[in-house]
């Protein structure tokens, strides 16, 4: 049997040799591929046909070593230089710039096809754009276009910095695509256009390459506890750079979106690394309700095709299905699935560098099954242990990508027809099914967020119309499915067998705090009175009335705090106060938190109104008779650990986008002490782990571990720097944090960080709550104000929605429940429900009708998403205000600064900053 198997492989090899039409095989390169592959089953013969080209340099000729060679990875400047060489030496390669990262590095796309494809690239892009809009292209016209059009296949790599194989592999693949005369490669070159995004996140990639050469290259063991990842990837965002597809806030996402809308690729394939040995995405489900059935079926067909091709070449460990679900639409590559294309991804096993390690797979499970078990979706599993090299990773990913490109090359017309048909289906649904449109009134509590919602829809390619008083979004358009998905609540199945891969709710009106009306019919709408928006909209606030004082009606608008900082920067003498309670002034009601500005002038207020989208009323009223709090804007610090910077990065990004000044601090600042002399507020964003991890940080046995910018490692030291990442603040730093609060400071802790602060005793009245069987993946749920006199809830109604994921709960003793400012759900905790039974010695009292009516009217807890056993959380604390000494600890048991997405929740943090010294 073994001899027969080897004979088949030998036959395949000779067939490939015959295909290259007497091209000279690069024996040195191919031998090195063998040398750095640890097992012959990890290397298909199809990759051993790399040729020597007289004009086009191979990676070996260019770099002096092959791709996947032990100990070698390349910075973006080196990667781009190689592609530039290909573009200069081959007419089949086009290289174009696609913008800049936050740190100033370039994004590029590399386009590969035959000479005709490159020469007529604009024509092919025009054809896919026409197929993308069924309103402009009839079925008959589409068929004519399909006859001459070519599918565009977009392949991206390097989104996650530690996943280091694919950016290297793509250089070898590009060389293969432009030099090989093998039949299957020629088909790819001639029948499709391949677009390569060589490094999706250049900032993170360069940091990680420097990290590898500085700290991890040559380490003896993979699982020795040493951090395999650099602490920062992008300037702000770590792994969540692949969770930005709804916000489109980071440069990486903007570049991906720009590429999609320029090329309208038929398929997008994002290359990642995690599970063994090669996962081809389909997902376990449940699938997103608004992904066209054609796309869902394409996932299955293409996924199984790729796994079959890898298996056909004798490579074990390829599988589909048992990883990821297919629900959350905010991944980067989902720009394809959300816009009638096909978004897919691979996960290849990786070592976070170019070293070889013995890896143990024996306990790894996915979808409940061992990674080494033989299943219907994994017909040829890997052994419980594998000796895994960098080149193994290159082989697997490249084999899969070539198989996928070949599928597109041989099924191009079907893929193009499906692409058009999905857009056609979306338009038809918009025409025949409800909702027919959505209207967004401009006059709302936060008009700037109304404009933001309109802009965010346009970022997604959704058409928005405008009249004098509202925005109108018609459903009869190519991205109708995405529109309805974004604007209506999600209902995740409670009986789903496997836990969701990410958040399960994303209803933008709730996340933004904007009222939206869904229209079942368009009757009565004069569509000619609306104009199509072609550029970003902005709400310019207005100033009415007359007088020397200016008052702003506060309704938890996101831009109030930034406006106050801007005013103080322009005019240090400006007087700022806020109303402590609701007041009637000149027959107009102003709620608690409304801002009164004096010692300024009309021009400054007009500038604030226009810049920040806020309305003011000039008044000559005597405000001294109203109870007010003078505003002393705080000096804010945002704390970051060196072991988990994900959410700290989102917090920094949010503060910078809003225009709220802050200082970034770490363990060394806490250890140095004297915090209150420098800061009034310290924010600790969500951080993983427990109190022990928070105190100790990165294991000091690995120190010193510098993260500093040097000539040898120029990408390090950004956005923060330290001579030694190891160790944490220690008990001394925690005591300094306690003293900061006792001296009058405000400590704000978000989600898991709040639990850590409670565990450390910094919020002594708070204790952890056993949540039992509660399962609370990221969903939009109801919260209720318990203490309306607290300025933290200024601008919020009694009940409102928030976004919450799985996180720890906290609680106080019953006699301290006044520390609870907001609770989950509308019903009280069981120990707060009045006893209604008989009491010995007292006359029985019947349950009042009023109480019964109130119970019947309580709102559902889940607004969008799904929560199992919600009774375990209803009544528990959402926000606590704990006095400590002269200061306060404000504990949020959810994250109000989640991924720059839940903007409606963030003003509770802004309220805390405005009122930091008035929370007693």
Where are these regions (language model features)?
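Conserved beta-strand positions
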Residues: 270-271, 684
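Intrinsic-disorder/low-complexity accessory segments
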Residues: 23-193, 237, 243-244, 249-251, ...
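Active-site-proximal cap/loop segments of hydrolase catalytic domains
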Residues: 111, 205-234, 238, 254
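Bacterial Sec-dependent N-terminal signal peptides
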Residues: 1-24
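Short, solvent-exposed turn/loop segments enriched in Gly/Ser/Thr/Pro and often Arg
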Residues: 198-201, 212, 271-278, 753
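Carboxylate/His-rich catalytic cores and anion/metal-binding grooves
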Residues: 174-177, 191-214
């Amino acid at each position: 049997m073994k001899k027969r198997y080897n004979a088949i492989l030998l036959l395949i090899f000779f067939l490939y040799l015959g295909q290259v039409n007497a091209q000279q095989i690069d024996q040195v390169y191919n031998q090195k591929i063998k040398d750095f592959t640890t097992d012959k089953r990890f290397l298909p013969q199809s990759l051993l046909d790399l040729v020597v080209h007289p004009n086009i340099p191979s990676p070996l000729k260019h770099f002096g070593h092959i791709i996947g060679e032990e100990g070698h990875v390349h910075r973006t400047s080196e990667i781009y230089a190689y592609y530039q060489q290909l573009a200069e030496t081959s007419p089949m390669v086009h290289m174009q710039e696609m913008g800049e990262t936050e740190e100033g590095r370039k994004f590029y796309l590399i386009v590969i096809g035959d000479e005709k494809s490159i020469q007529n690239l604009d024509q092919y892009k025009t054809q896919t754009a026409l197929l993308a809009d069924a309103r402009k292209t009839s079925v008959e016209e589409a068929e004519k276009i399909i006859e001459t059009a070519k599918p565009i296949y977009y392949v991206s790599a390097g989104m996650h910095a530690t996943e280091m194989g694919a950016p290297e592999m793509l250089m070898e693949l590009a060389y293969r695509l432009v030099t090989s005369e093998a039949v299957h490669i020629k088909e790819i070159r001639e029948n499709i256009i391949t677009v390569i995004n060589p490094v999706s996140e250049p900032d993170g990639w360069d940091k990680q390459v420097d990290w590898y050469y500085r700290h991890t290259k040559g380490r003896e063991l993979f699982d020795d506890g040493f951090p395999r990842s650099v602490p920062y990837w992008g300037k702000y965002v770590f792994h969540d750079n692949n969770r930005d597809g709804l916000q489109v806030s980071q440069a990486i996402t903007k570049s991906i979106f720009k590429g999609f809308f320029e090329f309208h690729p038929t398929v997008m394939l994002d290359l990642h690394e995690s599970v063994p040995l090669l996962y081809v995405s389909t997902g376990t489900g449940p699938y997103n309700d608004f992904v066209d059935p054609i796309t869902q079926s394409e996932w299955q067909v293409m996924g199984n095709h790729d796994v079959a091709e890898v298996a056909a070449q004798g490579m074990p460990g390829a599988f589909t299905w048992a990883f990821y679900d297919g629900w959350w639409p905010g991944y980067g590559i989902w720009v394809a699935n959300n816009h009638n294309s096909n978004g897919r991804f691979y996960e290849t096993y990786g070592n976070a560098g170019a070293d070889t390690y013995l890896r143990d797979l024996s306990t790894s499970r996915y979808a409940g099954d061992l990674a080494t078990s033989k299943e219907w979706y994994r017909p040829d599993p890997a052994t419980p242990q594998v000796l895994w090299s960098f080149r193994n990773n290159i082989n697997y990913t490249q084999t899969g990508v070539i198989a996928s490109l070949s599928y597109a090359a041989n099924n191009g017309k079907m893929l193009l027809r499906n692409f058009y048909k999905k857009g056609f289906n979306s338009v038809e649904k918009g025409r025949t099914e409800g909702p027919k449109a959505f209207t967004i009134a401009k006059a709302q509590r936060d008009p700037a967020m109304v404009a933001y919602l309109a802009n965010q829809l346009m970022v997604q390619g959704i058409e928005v119309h405008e009249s004098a008083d509202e925005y109108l979004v018609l459903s009869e358009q190519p991205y109708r499915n995405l529109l309805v998905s974004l604007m209506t609540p999600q209902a995740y199945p409670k009986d789903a067998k496997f836990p969701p891969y990410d958040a399960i709710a994303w209803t933008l009106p709730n996340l933004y705090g904007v009222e939206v009306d869904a229209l079942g019919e368009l009757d009565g709408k004069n569509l000619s009175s609306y104009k199509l928006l072609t550029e970003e909209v902005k709400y310019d606030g207005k100033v009415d009335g007359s007088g020397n004082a200016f008052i702003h009606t506060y309704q938890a608008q996101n831009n109030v705090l930034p406006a106050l900082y801007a005013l103080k920067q322009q005019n240090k003498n400006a007087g700022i106060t806020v109303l402590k309670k609701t007041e009637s002034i000149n027959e107009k009601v102003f709620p608690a938190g409304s801002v009164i500005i004096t010692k300024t002038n009309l021009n400054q207020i007009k500038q604030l109104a226009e810049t920040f989208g806020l309305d003011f009323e000039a008044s000559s009223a005597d405000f001294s008779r109203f109870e007010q709090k003078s505003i002393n804007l705080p000096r804010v610090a945002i704390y970051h650990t060196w072991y988990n910077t994900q959410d700290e990065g989102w917090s920094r990004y949010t503060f910078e986008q809003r225009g709220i000044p802050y200082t970034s601090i770490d363990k060394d600042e806490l250890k140095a002490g004297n915090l209150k002399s420098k800061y009034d507020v310290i924010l600790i964003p969500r951080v993983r782990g427990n109190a022990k991890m928070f105190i100790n940080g990165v294991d000091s046995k690995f120190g010193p571990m510098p993260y500093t910018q040097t000539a040898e490692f120029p990408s390090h030291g950004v956005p923060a720097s330290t001579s030694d990442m190891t160790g944490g603040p220690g008990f001394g730093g925690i005591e300094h944090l306690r003293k900061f609060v006792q001296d009058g400071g405000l400590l704000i802790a978000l989600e898991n960080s709040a639990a850590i602060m409670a565990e450390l005793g910094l919020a002594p009245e708070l204790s952890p709550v056993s949540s039992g069987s509660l399962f609370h993946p990221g969903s939009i749920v109801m919260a209720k104000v318990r203490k309306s006199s607290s300025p933290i809830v200024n601008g919020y109604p009694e009940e409102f929605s928030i976004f919450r994921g799985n996180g720890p709960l906290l609680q106080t003793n019953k006699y301290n429940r006044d520390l609870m400012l907001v609770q989950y759900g509308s019903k009280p905790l069981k120990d707060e429900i009045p006893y209604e039974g008989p009491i010995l010695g007292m006359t029985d009292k019947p349950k009042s009708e009023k109480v019964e009516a109130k119970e019947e009217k309580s709102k559902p807890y889940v607004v969008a998403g799904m929560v199992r056993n919600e009774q375990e959380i209803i009544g528990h604390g959402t926000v606590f205000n704990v006095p400590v000494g002269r200061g306060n600890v404000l504990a949020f048991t959810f994250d109000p600064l989640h991924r720059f997405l839940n903007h409606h929740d963030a003003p509770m943090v802004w309220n805390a900053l405005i009122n930091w010294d008035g929370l007693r």
